[in-house]
Structure formats: C-alpha cells, structure tokens
Amino acid sequence: MNNEIITGLLLPFLGTTAGSACVFFMKHELSRNVQRMLAGFAAGVMTAASVWSLIIPAMELAEGMGRLSFIPAVAGFWFGVLFLLLLDTVIPHLHMNAEKAEGVPSKLARTTMMVLAVTLHNIPEGMAVGIVYAGLLHGTAEMSSGGAFALALGIAIQNFPEGAIISMPLRAEGKKKSAAFGGGVLSGAVEPAGALLTILFSSLILPAMPYLLSFAAGAMIYVVVEELIPEISEGEHSNIGVIMFSVGFTVMMALDTALG
C-alpha cells in the first residue's frame, strides 16, 4: 500500500478531526441556520459523489465487463439502501435536535447515541473510499488516481462541518471540550477502518466492484434523504439549506470532473 492510498484513506478522517476541533475555538453551540448550512453542504457533496464517483463508474465498469450496465447499478443501489435501513432499525442512535432515539430501545446516554448517529452516516463514506482505492490498486481502468483523490477530498471537505456538528452539541450537552472533541473524532474513525478493511479484501471483491460502488452510493443517498434533508428543512422555513446543498453538489461535481 503506497503513500497515495494511505493519504486517500486518512483524508476523510482528518476532515472530521479538524471539524471536531472547532469545539476548542467556538464558545457557543452552532445556530440553527448554521446547522442547516452545514447539513445542506454535506448533502450536496454526498449526492454528487454518489453519482459522479460511484454510480457512473459502476455502470462503466459493468459495461466493460460485458454486462448490462444498469443491472449492477440498480441492484447494488438497493442493497445499499436496505443495508442502511437495517442498521438504522437495529442500532440505537439519536439525530441532532431530536428528542426521541431511533433503533432498538436502549439505555445508552444521549451523547453516545448522538455519536452513533454520525457513525452510521460515516460507514458508507468509508466504504466508498475503500472501494475506489481498491479498484485503483488492482489497475481497474475506470478508476483513476485523480478520481479517487477527488472522492476522498470531497468527503473530507464535507466531514469538516460534520465534525463540528457532532462536537458542538456534545459540548452543549455538558461534556468537557476534550470529551466532545473525542466524540467527534470517534465518529469519524469508522471511515479509515472501513476503507482499510475493504482494501484488504479487495482481491475477493474485485469481480463485484460494480455492485459495491453502487452499494456505497445507495447507502450514501439513504443518509442524505433520511438524515440530512430533514435537518435542512426542520423548523422555520429557510432556503439556506437548499443553497448550500447546491454549493456542495457543484463543489464535488467540479472536483470529480477536474481531477478524475
């Protein structure tokens, strides 16, 4: 595993860590409008990454293998949606600004369930980076070094506000700054771990690469629709979330087309 791949795997985690560090510099919890802006931006990045970095390469890869391109894309996408739906149903977690936890009944602390909610969010992102770099490692023609880096960088950019979104509310819940920072960092640790595991098993998953790429896309779109869009539209009406969604979408689209 070369330095390029190691950098790509660590970039998203560094984005979360940097965002979590905001708890040391900001005195007050993020305002509702700021949370909307950050959630909108993250949703835009994830949606664009799902299309340009995952679904389109999945279809191109399937076509190169002599398969009907839409079948792996559709099947993998649905597997990703159903997988996140299963995790969402089983794992106890608490979304930002929510009073009632989701998942199986649990006596876990509110702060723990808040971290679990963001951790669920980060699972498909880690898988997406790992799958793309696994394809690059094995010389898959549809995977370029620039495209893989664009995906990792795009996720790192949207992880920065996510780190702040988790650490600041933890601080507001009464946690010490160091503990709030640690919670944010912990929520992002699943990304490099998941990406590394994907690469370690890359020789086994290579034939299923089109399905896995679209699987990651389906999981990411599930997170956007189930978690981020409600955050954008919650409370008093505002267009700022939609504007920031568009900004995030165009940033990720530009990154992928420029570097890919």
Regions found by a protein language model. Name each.
Residues 1-260:
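Intrinsically disordered, metal-sensing/regulatory segments
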